[in-house]
Amino acid sequence: MRNIIVKISSSKNEIMFNFEMEDDDRHNPTDNFSFGKRYASIKTNNYDLKEVHNDLLALSIILMCNPFVGKRLKLPFKISKRFEDSVKNVLTRYSIEAEGSYIPHREINTRYRPALAFSGGVDSTAALAVMPANTAPIFMDRPVSKGSLYNPAAAHNSCKILNEIGFDAERVECDLEYL
């Protein structure tokens, strides 16, 4: 049986995901899109990414790879039994294979707060307006590719204004969009 194999390298401020596709994987799930780059990274200066729970990393990997997985997605770390059971209830096309025995599940702590994938546009600004006051708006600041019409200046300015009025807006360097 073949599968997508995921490798992760990380430091305090960066997580790098590398994906190895094998024969049964779906390189082109439809005529409209295909697996682009075989790697992605997330960088931030304000959070220790080594503290991210494995279940959250696994969820991120599933969301990145889902259209392309053939029969199995192989994770390079342990996950909790609770997460594995939850995934089995949702994923039907493929299975998740993690390394070794289970780890404790992620506990929800009262000091945690909600976050919002903030684009800087009208919709995410409206969503932020109805979220709890302690919501952290997170802008996924992707690199601008050569020839692109995309201009992040307005979103950068929105984040700056949010910080000025008391929000804790974060710009996270992220190239997930180019998978």
Enumerate the language-model features and the residues they cover:
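Intrinsically disordered, low-structural-confidence terminal and linker regions
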Residues: 1-5
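ATP-dependent adenylation/nucleotidyltransferase module used to activate substrates
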Residues: 7-74, 78-179
